[in-house]
Amino acid sequence: MHAPQPAPSPPGAAATGEAAEDRALRYLQARGLSVIARNYRCKTGEIDLVMRDVAGTLVFVEVRARVARSAQRFGGAAASVTPAKQRRLIAAAEDFLAGHPGEVPACRFDVIAIDGTRIEWMRDAFGVEA
């Protein structure tokens, strides 16, 4: 038996996702964060943006975007960051940190939710449970 595969993305989804990431990047840079990596990929997943805030905290950012009509039908962009997605992001962050040896900085997971024209920045949106 094969593991279930994610549904294919609708046409234009990659361009929409890239535009949302561009918008999120500009939004966060305007608020003092600096980009460390973009679209970090590893065997366990992908992190849209890896940034550092003014206090030196390493920030792993998941960008979620929904057009207004799908947000009404299926919930907002933030609702699409499921516990399974959170686990994949945490695993990818662990991989990122393993590839950057040295003292582990303070880290957090933020979500940028874009619903139509609205941007919501959820700092420390979820954490790693011990």
Curated annotation (Swiss-Prot):
SUPFAM superfamilies, alphabetized: Restriction endonuclease-like
Highest taxon of the lineage: Bacteria
A Pfam short name: UPF0102
MF term (GO), any: nucleic acid binding
InterPro entries: Restrct_endonuc-II-like, tRNA_endonuc-like_dom_sf, UPF0102_YraN-like
Record field: transmembrane: none
PANTHER family xref list: UPF0102 PROTEIN YRAN (PTHR34039:SF1)
Family, per entry: Belongs to the UPF0102 family.
Stored NCBIfam families: PRK12497.1-3 (NF009150), YraN family protein (TIGR00252)
Protein name: UPF0102 protein RSc3265
